[in-house]
Amino acid sequence: MKLVVLGATGGTGRLVVEQALAAGHTVTALVRSPEKLTLRNPNLHVIAGQATDPSAVSHALDGADALISTLGGTGSVISDATQAIVDAAPRAGVSRVVVLSSFLVERDRFDPVTRLLTGLAMRSMIKDKSAGEKALRQSDLDWTIVYASGLTDGPTGGPVVVLTEGRRWSLSHRIARADVAAWLVQAATSPQTSRRSISITGGARTKANVKLEAVRK
């Protein structure tokens, strides 16, 4: 497959690029600063541009099969970039979009005190990501949203748990970026995650290559 990656110079985005290439995919990375992506591979194409610019996103999506976004940022970067994806993807003939989000956005999964504290401390980020996800859910795109717990730089291959309905998040939940990256690449190529959200964290119940049919709606 030909995959487009947004956020490829970030900690998780770099791992998405590496794992996608290792799996035999062709990758196009749309980045603001190409010099920050030092990885070299004949199947990696780097394009300079803003993820918030629909024209740049459309250009990157030319001939692509799917898009994976691991974007972070402040202000309205996430919602603006998501709207750019919603606008550009149909014009480019691409419908498959996988977006990495934060467990902090799933506020109803926290206890009331944690919900209040994180809501105050991370209000801007939660508002931005929530707005972007709303635009994605209301679109006709074939989207998947992956909610990941706190990220670590540990090695891949650790256990991963999919939170089922009714399970609560804890601020102590952690997962390796490499395992999140593996999930994102799997999801981009799996019809089982179509128009679904997935909540993942590290744990002892399943292995890192846990089957995608365990996802929740």
Segments and roles (model prediction):
Residues 134-154:
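Conserved beta-loop-beta element that borders a ligand/cofactor-binding pocket
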Residues 4, 28, 144:
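Conserved beta-strand positions in the Rossmann-like core of class I SAM-dependent methyltransferases
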